[in-house]
Every structure is written in structure tokens, then in C-alpha cells.
Design a protein with these regions (language model features):
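Mid-domain beta-loop-alpha active-site segment that forms a flexible
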Residues: 63, 88-103, 121-133, 186, ...
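Oxidoreductase and adenylate-handling cofactor-binding alpha/beta cores
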Residues: 95-116, 132-142, 195-202
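Helical "substrate-binding/catalytic lid" subdomain
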Residues: 122-153
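Active-site Gly/Thr loop motif
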Residues: 143-171
Length: 204
């Protein structure tokens, strides 16, 4: 048989993992459901959210990552463009963030008696997971008068996070006799400990 509003009176969470408004057209919108269950949490996980020019665009996989700037086409030796090997970020990050939000909303509903409507865009999830590069890009857009380095680096202007650290020495991977080691002493306290440990306080 069909699904009725009464089927949702004891539900904690309803997840709409389709184009926004699909359940609404079936008479099962958040507004409909909360009439029979005020504590219900309605989580809509879509590609590009519920507003904007891409609201109803069907897509999946790497499409969210290209929208967020996480992946770009590559060229082969003949100059032909192709999509490089890339782990899909948005289609995993979006639902994961939705699960966190839904569980938090359930805890709130049990305390307050009020449900919640949650909107999750998988493209937004991809952009969130790529915050290192985004923040680094924005850092270089700041006025030169704004210092982005620190005293130990002579206040040298540089991007944040791990982006742009190819020439860095305090946050770097090094090849060793038996493999590789990841050296992470970007913070002042850790760099000081390292300098003391190797007897080179002149580098601090």
C-alpha cells in the first residue's frame, strides 16, 4: 500500500535524498509531517541545495566537486582533455554532514519538543572539504598591509594550511633511509622544541 502521514508519527528522522520538493509533491513535506509529529527532523540532501539556478539540476558523482573547484580537467601528451583520477568528495561529504546535523537536531528535539528542517547540498559539502585551498586563495587576496606570516618566518607572506608549501621546511614530508617522515612543526612551540632538540636555537 501507499505511505500515509500516520506512518511518520513515531519517526525521528526523514531523509529526502532526491531532487528538492519530491516528497512535497507526494504530500509528505516537512510542513505536512510536523502536523502529525512536531518533533520530526526532515533532512533534504540534494545536489545543489533548494535555491539557486542549479536547484533542479540532476547530477551525481564528480559533478559536485567540479562545481566546488576541487577537480579540474587534465591534458594528456597529445593535448586531449580528460578527467583525472579523483575521489568523489561531495557525494560522500554531503550525506556525512547531513547525518551529523540530523543527529544533533534529534537531540535538540528530544529536549525542546521541536523538530527541524535541514538542507544539505552535496556541492556545498565538497566546497567545505576543500577549505584549505579556498582559504589559501583568499589569503593572497588580502591587502599587502595585512601580515599572514609570523615572526619566526620574518613575517613572510604565504598561504595558510598545507597549500603552497612546496618550498616549506617546517611543514613538509622528507625522504628517509627506510621510507618517509612527515615533519609538522609549523606552530611556534613545536618549532622551538625541535630547534632545542637538535641544538640549533639559532634557527628559532
Amino acid at each position: 500500500g501507499g505511505t500515509s502521514l500516520g506512518d511518520f508519527k513515531d519517526c525521528d528522522i526523514v531523509i529526502e535524498a532526491m531532487k528538492p520538493g519530491t516528497l512535497d509533491r507526494l504530500g509528505l513535506s516537512y510542513e505536512d509531517l510536523k502536523k502529525v509529529n512536531p518533533k520530526i527532523v526532515f533532512c533534504c540532501v540534494s545536489g545543489y541545495g533548494m535555491t539557486g539556478p542549479y536547484e533542479n539540476m540532476p547530477s551525481h558523482g564528480v559533478a559536485y566537486d567540479t562545481w566546488a573547484g576541487c577537480v579540474e580537467p587534465a591534458r594528456d601528451e597529445e593535448g586531449m582533455v580528460y578527467l583525472p583520477a579523483h575521489p568523489s568528495i561531495g557525494m560522500h561529504a554531503g550525506p556525512l554532514l547531513g547525518a551529523f546535523a540530523a543527529l544533533a537536531a534529534v537531540m535538540r528535539a528530544r529536549e525542546t519538543g521541536e523538530g527541524a528542517f535541514l538542507e544539505i547540498g552535496q556541492s556545498d559539502g565538497a566546497a567545505y572539504m576543500d577549505w584549505y585551498r579556498i582559504e589559501s586563495y583568499k589569503a593572497y587576496q588580502r591587502p599587502q598591509s595585512e601580515v599572514t606570516g609570523n615572526a619566526a618566518d620574518d613575517f613572510r607572506r604565504r598561504p595558510v594550511g598545507t597549500a603552497g608549501l612546496k618550498e616549506g621546511v617546517r611543514y613538509q614530508a622528507y625522504e628517509c633511509k627506510d621510507g618517509y617522515v612527515l615533519f609538522m612543526a609549523s606552530e611556534q612551540a613545536f618549532w622551538k622544541n625541535f630547534c632545542e632538540g637538535v641544538g640549533r636555537m639559532d634557527m628559532f
